[in-house]
Amino acid sequence: MPLAKRIIPCLDVDKGRVVKGVQFVDIRDAGDPVEVAKKYNEQGADEITFLDITASHEARETTINTVEKIAAEVFIPLTVGGGIRTLDDIRNMLNAGADKVSINSAAVKDPDFVRIAAEKFGSQCIVVAIDAKRVSADGEPGRWEIFTHGGRNPTGIDAVEWAVRMTEYGAGEILLTSMDRDGTKDGFDLGVTRAISEAVRVPVIASGGVGNLQHLVDGVIKGGADAVLAASIFHFGEYTVPEAKAYMEQHGIEVRL
């Protein structure tokens, strides 16, 4: 029996507020993180992802306090990312109520960190986040590079090769964001989503670019994703999680209703 595909609302948190930008800039306020998380919990989201989008860039600790408040109100898996640099950071997040942590910049700086973290805490709670940007010209075979620090720093690392390496190091899940599509509402970058989904044996979460419910379906059917993550379509009331699940089910995708 195929595993149900997951719908994951994403809370990008900046200075204690949920925000949403376009291609990592042009930020718009979307509310209080605890209230927003409660709303998605009540709507039947499968999981929630909380990304402190300023943490890595400004090199400060993720707001443990907010995570504790969300975890007290939300009874679905919670992934927390942003500024996770040490084993203590992971331990603190898990103790605050996170089920998984998402590691991005720190993995690139020290890939062994992922291996050690997976050995210590278990692969099931280590998510490696990849912010990928297409670097091949139109008409050429797809090639994507990973960027770190909230999409600010190019690395020269091939996104597909990196995803494979990170799963070999023990990542239990890949959270893949297309920087080209982030906030654009043009749909996922299905090329990189499929390339990584086919290359790794762990679940891939597609992120970046959802503008309508068909995009969620495409992420699963054309992109091969195991889960689809979206922010603005849910934050600003265009669609609810139940509407998204009903639409996916109508298109032959198994979801938890």
From Swiss-Prot:
Catalysed reactions, semicolon-separated: 5-[(5-phospho-1-deoxy-D-ribulos-1-ylimino)methylamino]-1-(5-phospho-beta-D-ribosyl)imidazole-4-carboxamide + L-glutamine = D-erythro-1-(imidazol-4-yl)glycerol 3-phosphate + 5-amino-1-(5-phospho-beta-D-ribosyl)imidazole-4-carboxamide + L-glutamate + H(+)
Q: Name one GO molecular function term.
A: imidazoleglycerol-phosphate synthase activity
**Record-listed E.C. numbers:** 4.3.2.10
Q: Return the Gene3D superfamilies for the record.
A: Aldolase class I
Q: Which superkingdom heads the taxonomic lineage of this protein's source?
A: Bacteria
Q: Name one GO biological process term.
A: L-histidine biosynthetic process
Q: What class of enzyme is it?
A: lyase
Keyword Lyase tagged: yes
UniProt keyword annotations, A-Z: Amino-acid biosynthesis, Cytoplasm, Histidine biosynthesis, Lyase
The pathway this protein participates in, as annotated, is: Amino-acid biosynthesis; L-histidine biosynthesis; L-histidine from 5-phospho-alpha-D-ribose 1-diphosphate: step 5/9
Keyword Lyase recorded: yes
Pfam families named among the record's database cross-references: His_biosynth
GO CC terms on record? Answer: cytoplasm
SUPFAM superfamilies cross-referenced by the UniProt entry: Ribulose-phoshate binding barrel
Cite the active-site annotation: D12, D131
Checking PANTHER family in the record gives: IMIDAZOLE GLYCEROL PHOSPHATE SYNTHASE HISHF (PTHR21235:SF2), IMIDAZOLE GLYCEROL PHOSPHATE SYNTHASE SUBUNIT HISF/H IGP SYNTHASE SUBUNIT HISF/H (PTHR21235)
Function summary: IGPS catalyzes the conversion of PRFAR and glutamine to IGP, AICAR and glutamate. The HisF subunit catalyzes the cyclization activity that produces IGP and AICAR from PRFAR using the ammonia provided by the HisH subunit.
Assembly notes: Heterodimer of HisH and HisF.
> Belongs to which family?
Belongs to the HisA/HisF family.
Name listed for the protein in its UniProt record: Imidazole glycerol phosphate synthase subunit HisF
Organism this protein belongs to: Teredinibacter turnerae (strain ATCC 39867 / T7901)
